[in-house]
From Swiss-Prot:
Compartmental location: Secreted; Nematocyst
Annotated signal sequence range: 1-19
GO cellular component terms, A-Z: extracellular region; nematocyst
Family, per entry: Belongs to the Cnidaria small cysteine-rich protein (SCRiP) family. alpha subfamily.
Keyword Secreted: yes
Assigned keywords, A-Z: Cleavage on pair of basic residues, Disulfide bond, Nematocyst, Neurotoxin, Secreted, Signal, Toxin
Keyword Ribosomal protein found: no
Superkingdom to which the source organism belongs: Eukaryota
Organism placement in taxonomy: Eukaryota, Metazoa, Cnidaria, Anthozoa, Hexacorallia
Residues excised as propeptide: 20-39
Name of protein: Small cysteine-rich protein 1 2
Protein task: Induces neurotoxic symptoms on zebrafish. Has also been claimed to be implied in calcification, but tests on homolog proteins suggest that proteins of this family have a neurotoxic function and not a calcification function.
């Protein structure tokens, strides 16, 4: 009798868990897509069409390093030509 009761409890537990919606698949659009949640859309670099690039990476083609504020200490602003 004890084994049957344990099996019934196990089936009830599995049915309860499997009926729950998966919240991991929902996308939260309220979070910023920048790393570490840094918000740069209103920065001087972004206003002039620049992008914050890590200092270890060269600026992309057709861009140059410009001295505009708004990037973190480990990044620099790359502006379009």
């Amino acid at each position: 009798m004890g084994v049957n009761f344990n099996i019934c409890l196990l089936l009830l537990l599995v049915a309860t868990i499997s009926s729950q919606p998966l919240k991991a698949t929902e996308k939260d659009d309220s979070t910023d897509e920048n790393p570490f949640g840094i918000y740069r859309r209103g920065s001087q670099c972004a206003v002039y069409g620049g992008r914050c690039i890590p200092t270890s990476v060269r600026c992309p083609p057709n861009t140059f390093q410009c001295d505009l504020s708004g990037c973190s200490w480990s990044e620099r602003c790359c502006c379009h030509l």
